[in-house]
Amino acid sequence: MNIQALLSEKVRQAMIAAGAPADCEPQVRQSAKVQFGDYQANGMMAVAKKLGMAPRQLAEQVLTHLDLNGIASKVEIAGPGFINIFLDPAFLAEHVQQALASDRLGVAMPEKQTIVVDYSAPNVAKEMHVGHLRSTIIGDAAVRTLEFLGHKVIRANHVGDWGTQFGMLIAWLEKQQQENAGEMELADLEGFYRDAKKHYDEDEEFAERARNYVVKLQSGDEYFREMWRKLVDITMTQNQITYDRLNVTLTRDDVMGESLYNPMLPGIVADLKAKGLAVESEGATVVFLDEFKNKEGEPMGVIIQKKDGGYLYTTTDIACAKYRYETLHADRVLYYIDSRQHQHLMQAWAIVRKAGYVPESVPLEHHMFGMMLGKDGKPFKTRAGGTVKLADLLDEALERARRLVAEKNPDMPADELEKLANAVGIGAVKYADLSKNRTTDYIFDWDNMLAFEGNTAPYMQYAYTRVLSVFRKAEINEEQLAAAPVIIREDREAQLAARLLQFEETLTVVAREGTPHVMCAYLYDLAGLFSGFYEHCPILSAENEEVRNSRLKLAQLTAKTLKLGLDTLGIETVERM
């Protein structure tokens, strides 16, 4: 049930009947304050100006055509021409009943699309670090939301699995006579990588061998391909452990690394030349883009092939977008890549559009995000100033949560405590990130994220268990409750019901904008409204059975909404805390 969409259409029709153009925008929004009703239509100002009318005069005319019978109990004009809409308690009660009768809580399915989501993208032969966290969990929240709404989602883990580093690694492994890569842990590979890089920089003979190995690997030599595959396998096996710990839906089947696009690159360069988009410049192949200017104010040159014949990330990203449209048949492509890559992506996509590889009707969206900072406001590092490995971060989260949970539940059995600590610890790390607007940097703070107050995972998980405890005390099952009517008489009942029915609107925003913090804010607000409702509207000690059962149904929908909302974020719920 999308009340905002329903009201928008009703107000738009009334505006047209009052003389507004057919493309008028009613600007129906959820009201910020309860005294302004549940929704507010703010579109009169812009339209009245075009019509040469006073906004309030237009609002009065719109009201004469606005039929909200059975939806609103009151509609009023406020200020210069805002229209405040107060939902009818009977309408709220009816739709709470409908939401409870639906497995999807009354959430409709939009027109199905094929949506490719590019996220996580770790590098082969390196352990995942905290820099991979945001892309991985924000991207996964978007995937979960889009899948719940019924879209066909293709996860694309754009792994860094190609390039000169593989020549280096294979050459160094060979030198050490440790070619059986299958027996190595990833931590060994990280050490190998550092040693290989050192030799590559200092030993010209070794560097030359590494460069030759890259050529052999790229030409398809089976020995080198097999070594490369082993390196990829070790890395992705280790990464899968991290994905599973994070409760992220990525699997090995979702890997679409840089190597996938490599065979396409010569053809793309040739095609861009044939189309007159790419030209030779100082031995390299370059596309000059009018949309981007260099320091001299001239069109910026984007290199797609170096003079030594090598390709660049831009070339791969052009091939990648082309593949996602032509082969995966994407209707929409979302990229969860940090904000520092924005210009690079915009340049690649400008070339993609000019070449006609992806039509304008298929959005390519950079859902960029900021950095994770320490308490000092600088990039999050270890005490020694090194990169924090993601596995180490999750270990610490689990240890801190274990202490916290044991303190609150000294008699809890060990296996139950471990399960609860895992849900709280991993949930806390994820929720702390997801609850912040992804476009901004955020401060990583253990104390804040593990607090049982405020917009945190422990608070939300506790709020869910609190609602469940009402049912345990009520000793009533869902079947018994199903036949009971919902009756809304108190203001707090109406406020809770209206917020519950805004779940679909929240999902729609997250799906459109890729902003899971909107869901976090909604769930936190919902938990707060339930708390106020629980305090002021007695449930178990209600004046009669009808009111008791009606309030239990509001509690039931609250629990289901919290659980489903947290699930779209990849946050685990627990039955008891």
Swiss-Prot record:
Gene that specifies this protein: argS
Record GO cellular component, one term: cytoplasm
NCBIfam families per UniProt: argS
EC number: 6.1.1.19
Keywords, in A-Z order: Aminoacyl-tRNA synthetase, ATP-binding, Cytoplasm, Ligase, Nucleotide-binding, Protein biosynthesis
Reaction(s) catalysed (UniProt annotation): tRNA(Arg) + L-arginine + ATP = L-arginyl-tRNA(Arg) + AMP + diphosphate
Main subcellular location: cytoplasm
PANTHER family with a match to the protein in the record: ARGININE--TRNA LIGASE, CYTOPLASMIC, ARGINYL-TRNA SYNTHETASE
HAMAP family to which the protein is assigned, alphabetical: Arg_tRNA_synth
Native source organism of the sequence: Escherichia coli O6:K15:H31 (strain 536 / UPEC)
Recorded family membership: Belongs to the class-I aminoacyl-tRNA synthetase family.
InterPro entries according to UniProt: aa-tRNA-synth_I_CS, Arg-tRNA-ligase, Arg-tRNA-synth_N, Arg-tRNA-synth_N_sf, ArgRS_core, DALR_anticod-bd, Rossmann-like_a/b/a_fold, tRNAsynth_Ia_anticodon-bd
Stretch forming the signal peptide: none
Motif 'HIGH' region positions after renumbering to this chain: 122-132
The protein's assembly and partners: Monomer.
GO molecular function, one term: ATP binding
Compartment annotation: Cytoplasm
UniProt name for this protein: Arginine--tRNA ligase
Segments passing through the bilayer: none
Annotated GO biological process: arginyl-tRNA aminoacylation
